[in-house]
UniProtKB/Swiss-Prot annotation:
Name by which UniProt lists this protein: Vitellogenin-6
Gene name of this polypeptide: vit-6
Pfam families linked to this entry: Vit_open_b-sht (PF09172), Vitellogenin_N (PF01347), VWD (PF00094)
Domain of life: Eukaryota
Domain called VWFD: residue spans: 1340-1515
Gene3D superfamilies attached to this UniProt entry: Lipovitellin, beta-sheet shell regions, chain A, Lipovitellin-phosvitin complex, chain A, domain 4, Vitellinogen, superhelical
Tissues in which the protein is found: Synthesized in Caenorhabditis only by 32 cells building the intestine of adult hermaphroditic individuals; they are cotranslationally secreted into the body cavity and subsequently taken up by the gonad.
GO cellular component: extracellular region
A GO molecular function held by the record: nutrient reservoir activity
Domain Vitellogenin positions: 34-716
Biological role: Precursor of the egg-yolk proteins that are sources of nutrients during embryonic development. May play a role in cholesterol uptake. May be involved in thermotolerance.
Region (Disordered): 1527-1556
Keywords associated with the record: Disulfide bond, Glycoprotein, Secreted, Signal, Storage protein
Residues carrying covalently attached carbohydrate according to the record: 252, 1288
């Protein structure tokens, strides 16, 4: 036994001796300085780790050890050789901040002999005073080996003479002398500024030198950066800071500056990369190198002399990177041979990977490895030559199964484009041109991948141009468009300003100026020779994608050439977008004159401003924009400018913070209101959020540009951007729409529908079209007035829909007469849609099959490390997807005269596999190590759905989903951090799989949750892990979740049924519920009526409802089998003044009902009606939880006072405002189970906390002394009646009372109105979508009074009517010889303000006028007498009696409301820029309002006279039009004279409102005074006459007195008729109160409130 123990100890000792053979080397130092003819040996240890800079997190580590022999020859020449070099790797969880023993690593045992020989080759360098000058390597040495030797030499460089900039401080005798200085040196990592700090140790005769590299001050750095994000100046200061690099060397030196010896060196270096956010740590490459002197003495063995005249420098050699770049850009095989050949069997590797992919396709499942396989194929293809690609292509194209072969070919061509080398692109182009195995449409999609290629070049661009100009592109417009747009993007990658960093060598320019000029000339020539608008736009978008600085000059000519269409000029302005950071000043100089020129089209001006703001101009340009904004008359341009500036001022994007502050300063000096923006459609909006701490953010932009030429938006745009993979992706995605004159097509379609009806448009066979003949009066009117037709732009209707990605035009779709497919045109015959043609098209269905492989994005950074090996950080997202299926349509019933049903079936099998890879690896031909974080997702979601729709009697929609027949995995999500090592054998025939080790946190550092849950038809299983430490991010933790679908039924069916307007008989017991309604429980005082009166009014209301039409509306929703079932039933009368709605579900039952009081027709009826109560009652039961709610709506005293102020306004408008209910009292009784009660209490506490923080001065919460009845909430809401923008609210709960006073709302609050609303039967019978379009299109409003007209564009001017008809509004843009409508008005009595209004609409003539008997209406000569609730229904219009004094003509085009004196005209927005008459030009512009009958801008008198219809039946005073006071514009700030047009009857005249007595406030310097007795003051503050002074007694208090300031606010809100006793006592008790006599202004007469 002892023998075995002794043997074991001996073995351990021998092993220990073997393991530490380098660490136990004896040191023999015989020299004190470097001298010629001597030999020095150092032990070099290098350790390079890749992973997170957090202890005990995954690290992939490379370890290098070697003996370095240095021999000084003569002078300053040094020979160096590496001996006994060893290389090792490790995946262990180690702290890489210290040098680990070599024996803890796994050594590469059989290192390639070639590698050994390369590393042992000698090297010579000039070494003068510690600085390395010229280096000479062996001729056969390779770049990677040279760089390792440079790393060793780099550690010997120290500026021992201290020649350069010196900064030192003398120390005291007790301190060691130290000094520091800076110098610019060439180091392995670049030519940068370095800082030296020297500490001299006198006792030991040593010097400690510290050297650090300042990477912020480098003139040259050998790194590569391939990124797809645009340049962002501010982002470089925010997001780039976290990609830090630091290198520090510590030297131990003995001797003097002329004779020294380096005893030891330690280097620590770290390169940080932020894959997601700074908060969640960074990915780090940490280098630790040490060199320790172990021998200094006589030469043992002579190092061979290097016979190479070529010299190199110390900076990292990028020959390998240069060869890789040149191979990709040029395709010359000499560069391919210079690359490290890691395998000789590339073709066989790719064949096997495609075979594996074919099996996965055959199995019909998307696997996690599919995305990995795509990435590996791309990697190998990037190093394949033309011959190898042909072999691979033959293998892919010759698969036995044609369906699988089709998908493989599609993936292969995608990978060719993803590889992005010139050789792969040439094969792609050749195959597309030969039309072999790739359809042009698929080629047009695949070629888009080249937009973000890694190594673009002019040679590759010319290859793409060859495809663009080929016959196959000419035959397929989609391919031609994709080709040219991609060509521009590739040119931009080579010649434009991008964040890419390429390898530069020997001053070779990738894009010389003459090459750029040729490209610009080529594209400009293409633009000039284009015969169609589409071709011109394509050329401009290609120029935009190219982003060449030389394109500015031809683009400027196009923009300023007014002979070009507006669309072309706008596209030329958009073509500046890629130059906004490269040439901002030039863009501003070109576009600022365009924006400032008011003669330019509005669309061009707004587009120019948009691009100017994108350049983030300096203050000088912004001040010009602000000055233009102050005087801008074009309302659309002004609104767009304001909204654009406001959006940038409030922006949080890190790319625009500096600019945002400048814009905010500009807006602070420009007064504007949000209403100026909201009133107009042209608007620009931004919504952004950004967290600097988390380095995450998102921004959404939206813009709509409207002009006076069109009712449709001229341009609309929406875009998104944000942080992705640690970079702010500006202009990430954008979609837009631009159009010109498309309203022509829409208007024709709407006109056909209005004239013929939809049932005559969609027919089975052709029908004869009807005719239209104008009336004799209309013909005479047009002939005498000679009204010139308003013509829109002569350009034919056209539009473009475009998509942009990363600020590049990705695709655009032209829409015009030529682009409409022939199949659609054949369906339209004689202006009608033939159902038979529709059925034939739909019967064909849509069959689709597609497979795609793509990198959603790819970012690569390669940085050299001080160990001589580069590290590469890659962030990419390889994705593979496929889909096969079909869509079929059927109309029901088949072959019928019409159709009332539709059947749609969708069958598809989409499959997606995607992997987000964050990888940091050490690039070395011996062995690769690294760390990567994999986030993978797989989706397999088969779809088999059928939708059936029927609308014959009621709307029924059935959706049937057929489930899979067996259990299927539909989703899988996995997160996996791994460290890996890879050793490549050149003769390997399969892709070298790395040895991976998944990192798992220890149990005490993570919370694990196992998932094994089953839901109906769904099973979820997997493991979720969450770190316990905030330093460890979630995205590096291993997790896995799988979702399985388990069918237990064959299909699901969802049914939605809608049945409206069913006749219903009112039940008598409905009124019983309302009679129980008790007002005594409400919070406020008792109402003005008692309970008996309440019951009486309810009885009357329901008696009236018994004679009304009552309808039942039912909506049902159900999912079978028994998942959800819901039914909603509403019983309402025709005008919805009574409605009872019931909701029935499985556990939910709810009822809500309301009833309006009697609805008055006139103000007089409203005044006589005492009962004005709206009663709402509701009840809800859900399980054991119940809620009862009662709401009482009525009018407050403030509302009634407001009604008195507007009683002289036009009657119908008065009724609208007077009938509003502004006070709502609510009682809620509830019974909750414990858990819902807890939720309710929690949410109510959150609401109270919000009120305390948001409204601290206007809210208070009072605890009740005696808690009231439990489970009851009472509330009162009072809405301010004038603007309805503020509310007072009191909420009483059982324990407390919450009071809110004058809370401002962001919008005008709608309130209930109890006035009579006439029914429009013709309108009610329209389809829902037609109702919405009808309502939305009625935008313009013109008010015509006796002496004042407020036009459609809100321009007020004075006007005088005569006994002759004047044209108020007319369709002046109709393409037919006769207009669709004309509205005329004349004065019929000289002494009275009575008017006559005539409406000519089609073949009909409607005349309305005032007489002694009242309002008269004639339709085509037949008199219509007034009858309450009467309505004249015609096919195209209605005539409605609102009340005995007001009549309304209603049609789809125009609506006229007339009360005998005043008229209000509503006009459809489709007539914008096509209306003429006294109601103005109607183009949303106030400066172009007065266009006369000949379509010329004129003075107001001549404008009014041009629309006067003179005949033998009328005479007028010609002098009237010569008096300027009769026709003049009324400005907002101009005081208006008394208007006689507000009279309705002969005896009614404007009466001055008498001032009332109230307490007045006198503000004086440093004090506030209140009158002791009331004085006369106007209610609305508007005095009509000059005020008089009166001497009165006042109470005065200091202005600092809070009580006085509060009283002042209250009195101004609610005037006091006299002082209440309690307030008077408080006033007299105030400190420093004084009584004195002063003069106070007293009002004599007041202006009425002009509604």
């Amino acid at each position: 036994m002892k023998f075995f123990i002794a043997l074991a100890l001996l073995g351990a000792a021998l092993a220990s001796t073997h393991l530490d053979r380098y660490n136990s080397i004896e040191r023999n130092i015989q020299e004190s300085s470097f001298r010629a003819g001597r030999e020095y040996r150092y032990l070099f240890n290098g350790q390079l780790s890749a992973g997170l800079p957090v202890p005990s997190t995954p690290q992939g580590i490379s370890r290098l050890q070697s003996q370095v022999t240095l021999q000084w020859t003569d002078g300053n020449t040094v020979r160096m050789q590496l001996q006994k070099t060893r290389f090792a790797t490790s995946q262990q969880e180690s702290n890489s901040m210290k040098m680990l023993p070599f024996e803890r690593f796994e050594e590469v045992e059989r290192m390639n002999r070639e590698h050994q020989e390369l590393l042992s080759m000698p090297v010579e360098f000039d070494y003068e005073h510690g600085l390395v000058r010229e280096i000479r390597f062996a001729e056969n040495d390779q770049p990677w080996s040279e760089n390792i030797k440079r790393a060793v030499i780099n550690m010997l460089q120290v500026n021992i003479l201290k020649k350069e900039k010196y900064e030192g401080a003398e120390k005291s005798d007790n301190q060691e002398p130290t000094f520091s200085f800076t110098n610019v040196e060439r180091t392995l990592e670049g030519e940068c500024e370095v800082l030296y700090t020297v500490e001299e140790i006198k006792k030991e005769d040593e010097q400690r030198w510290a050297k650090s590299i300042n990477f912020d001050k480098c003139t040259r750095r050998p790194y590569i950066h391939h990124v797809q994000t645009p340049v962002c100046k501010d982002c470089q200061q925010t997001l780039e800071q976290d990609k830090m690099s630091s290198t520090v060397l510590n030297y131990n030196i003995t001797g003097t500056s002329s004779s020294f010896l380096i005893n030891s060196v330690e280097l620590r270096s770290q390169h940080l990369f932020a894959p997601i956010s700074e908060k969640h740590q960074l990915v780090s490459a940490f280098t630790l190198n040490t060199m320790e002197l172990i021998y200094a003495g006589e030469k043992k063995t002579e190092i061979k002399q290097v016979r190479n005249e070529k010299t190199s420098e110390l900076v990292y050699n990028q020959e390998s990177e240069w060869a890789e770049q040149q191979w990709a850009q040029t395709g010359e095989e000499k560069y391919l041979r210079q690359l490290p050949q890691w395998t000789e069997n590339k073709v066989e590797m790719i064949k096997k990977m495609f075979s594996l992919m074919a099996k996965q396709i055959e199995q019909g499942e998307a696997e996690l490895e599919a995305a990995h396989t795509v990435a590996r194929i791309v990697k190998v293809l990037r190093e394949c030559n033309e011959e190898q690609l042909e072999q691979i292509y033959r293998h892919v194209a010759e698969h036995k199964d044609e369906k699988i072969a089709e998908q493989l070919r599609s993936i292969y061509f995608n990978t060719l484009a993803l590889a992005g080398t010139r050789v792969t692109i040439q094969q792609f182009v050749d195959k597309v041109q030969s039309r072999k195995n790739i359809a042009p449409l698929k080629a047009s999609v695949a070629i888009k991948t080249l937009v973000d290629m890694r190594y673009p070049s002019l040679a590759i661009a010319e290859d793409i141009a060859r495809l663009c100009e080929s016959d196959v592109s000419s035959s397929f417009p989609a391919l031609r468009q994709s080709c040219w747009l991609t060509y521009g993007a590739i040119v931009n990658g080579v010649c434009g300003q991008t964040p890419r960093v390429f390898v530069q060598k020997n001053g070779v320019k990738m894009c010389p100026r003459d090459a750029k000029q040729r490209i610009v000339d080529k594209l400009v020539q293409q633009f000039e020779s284009a015969s169609t608008r589409y071709e011109k736009v394509l050329a401009l978008k290609t120029l935009a994608n190219a982003g060449l600085d030389l394109s500015v000059y031809p683009l400027e000519k196009i923009i300023l050439n007014e002979q070009h269409e507006t669309t072309i000029r706008t596209q030329a302005i958009e073509s500046f977008r890629r130059l906004r950071t490269q040439m901002p000043t030039k863009i501003q100089r070109v576009l600022m004159p365009v924006y400032l020129n008011r003669q330019q089209p509005q669309h061009i001006r707004m587009s120019a401003l948009h691009q100017i703001i994108y350049t983030q101009p300096e203050w000088s340009v912004l001040s010009q924009i602000g000055n233009q904004l102050r005087q801008e008359r074009n309302q659309q341009v002004r609104a767009f400018t304001l909204s654009l500036l406001r959006s940038y001022a409030n922006n949080e994007s890190p790319c625009e913070q500096t600019f945002s502050s400048r814009v905010q300063s500009l807006l602070n000096n420009i007064p504007f209101s949000s209403q100026e923006i909201d009133r107009f459609e042209s608007v620009y909006g931004k919504w952004s959020t950004y967290s600097r701490r988390h380095q995450s953010g998102f921004e959404a932009n939206f813009a709509s540009l409207f002009t006076t030429e069109s009712v449709l938006p001229t341009e609309m745009m929406a875009s998104i951007e944000g942080v992705l993979s640690g970079e702010w992706n500006q202009y990430f995605a954008q979609i837009g729409f631009t159009q010109k004159n498309m309203e022509k097509i829409i208007k024709k379609l709407l006109s056909n529908v209005q004239e013929k009806g939809l049932e005559q448009i969609v027919v089975r066979g052709k029908r004869a079209s009807g005719s239209f003949q104008p009336t004799e009066f209309l013909s005479n009117l047009l002939e005498k007035l000679r009204i010139t037709r308003r013509q829109s732009s002569e350009q034919d209707p056209h539009a473009f829909v475009y998509i942009r990605h990363r600020d590049m035009d990705y695709a655009f779709l032209p829409i015009d007469a030529d682009s409409i497919p022939e199949v659609v045109r054949s369906m339209i015959q004689g202006g009608r849609l033939e159902i038979g043609d529709i059925e034939r098209v739909l019967a064909q269905g849509i069959h689709f099959s597609a497979s795609n492989a793509a990198f959603l994005y790819e970012t690569v950074r390669r940085v050299p490390t001080p160990m001589g090996l580069p590290v590469q950080f890659t962030s990419k997202m390889p994705t593979i997807s496929s889909i096969r299926g079909q869509v079929t349509f059927e109309l029901e019933p088949k072959n019928g005269k019409s159709f009332d049903g539709l059947r749609l079936r969708v069958q598809a099998g989409p499959r997606v596999a995607s992997t987000h890879v964050l990888s940091l690896r050490v690039i070395c031909p011996i062995a690769e190590v690294g760390t990567k974080f994999l986030h993978q997702a797989v989706l397999n979601t088969p779809v088999d759905t059928e939708i059936r729709m029927n609308w014959e009697d009621k709307v029924v929609i059935r959706a049937i989903y057929n489930t899979p027949s067996e259990e299927k995995r539909i989703a899988m999500i996995q997160s996996r951090p791994v460290t890996f090592t890879r050793t490549v054998a050149p003769d390997a025939r399969q892709y070298p799989e790395p040895i991976e080790m998944t990192y798992m946190l220890p149990a005490h550092k993570q919370l694990s949750q196992s998932l094994d849950r089953e839901y109906p038809q769904i099973r979820v299983q997997g493991t979720l892990n969450r770190p316990t430490s905030v330093r460890i991010p979630q995205w590096i933790v291993d997790s896995n979740v799988e979702v399985y679908y388990k069918p237990n039924v064959e299909q699901y069916e969802a049914i939605f049924e809608l049945n409206l307007y069913n006749n219903y008989k009112m039940e008598k017991n409905y009124e019983k519920v309302y009679k129980k309604h008790n007002g005594r429980r409400y919070l406020e005082a008792e109402p003005e009526y008692d309970e008996e009166e309440h019951r009486e009014q309810i009885t009357k209301k329901f008696e009236w409802l018994q004679n009304e039409k009552v309808y039942q509306h039912v909506a049902k929703f159900e999912i079978k089998p028994e998942v959800v079932k819901m039914e909603v039933e509403a019983v309402c009368n025709n005008d919805f003044h009574f409605c009872k709605t019931q909701i029935r579900g499985e556990e939910l039952k709810a009822t809500i009902q309301y009833v309006y009081p009697q609805t008055p027709r006139t103000v007089e009826e409203l005044k006589e009606q005492k009962y004005r109560q709206l009663v709402v009652m509701g009840e809800m039961n859900y399980g054991e939880n119940t809620i009862h709610i009662n709401i009482n709506g009525q009018q407050s005293q403030e509302q009634k006072k407001f009604v008195k102020q507007i009683e002289q306004a036009p009657e119908h408008e008065t009724l609208l405002e007077a009938s509003r209910l502004d006070q709502y009292q609510t009682v809620v009784e509830y019974e909750f189970e414990p858990k819902p009660a807890q939720y309710f209490a929690r949410y109510w506490n959150m609401v109270q906390a919000y009120l305390r923080t948001q409204y601290p001065w206007t809210s208070r919460i009072e605890t009740r002394e005696e808690p009231s009845r439990k489970n009851m909430i009472r509330a009162t809401i009072n809405v301010e009646p004038r603007q309805r923008l503020t509310v007072n609210m009191t909420i009483e709960t059982p324990m407390e009372t919450t009071v809110l006073e004058r809370v401002e709302l962001p919008f005008r609050l709608p309130t209930a109105q109890i006035h009579y609303q006439p029914r429009n039967s013709r309108y009610e019978q329209k389809p829902v979508m037609e109702k919405i379009a009808h309502h939305a299109s009625k935008q313009a409003n013109c008010v015509v009074k006796s002496t004042k007209i407020n036009t459609f564009d809100q321009v007020a001017y004075r006007n005088q009517f005569t006994p002759c008809y004047s044209v108020l509004a007319k369709d002046c843009g109709s393409e037919k010889s006769e207009p669709r409508f004309v509205v005329l008005m004349k004065k019929i009595n000289e002494k009275k303000e009575w008017k006559n209004v005539k409406v000519v609409y089609g073949e009909n003539e409607i005349e309305m006028y005032k007489t002694e008997e009242g309002l008269i209406c004639r339709v085509n000569g037949e008199e219509i007498e007034y009858q309450p609730e009467s309505e004249i229904e015609k096919k195209q219009y209605n005539i409605i009696w609102l009340n005995k004094n007001t009549l309304k003509f209603d049609s789809d085009d125009v609506t006229v409301q007339f009360d005998g004196v005043n008229a209000r005209i509503h006009l459809s927005a489709l007539y914008r820029n096509q209306q003429c008459g006294l109601c103005g030009h109607y183009d949303n512009e106030k400066e172009t309002e007065f266009y006369d009958a000949e379509n010329q801008e004129n003075t107001i008198p001549k404008f009014a006279k041009s629309y006067l219809y003179k005949d033998s039946k009328c005479n007028y005073e010609r002098e009237m039009f010569e008096k300027e006071e009769n026709f003049q514009r009324i400005e907002k700030n101009q005081e208006e004279e008394k208007d006689q047009e507000m009279n309705y009857e002969e005896s009614r005249r404007e009466q001055d409102d008498e001032p009332t007595e109230q307490v007045a406030i006198v503000e004086r310097q440093h004090e506030i005074c209140f009158t002791q007795k009331p004085v006369l003051r106007c209610q609305n503050g508007k005095s009509q006459e000059s005020k008089k002074q009166k001497v009165t007694s006042v109470y005065c208090l200091p202005s600092s007195n809070s009580w006085a300031r509060r009283q002042m606010r209250e009195i101004r809100r609610e005037p006091l008729a006299q002082w209440p006793e309690h307030k008077l006592r408080n006033l007299r008790d105030q400190p420093q109160m004084e009584e004195r006599t002063v003069r106070v202004a007293v009002d004599q007469k007041c202006d009425k409130f002009d509604y």
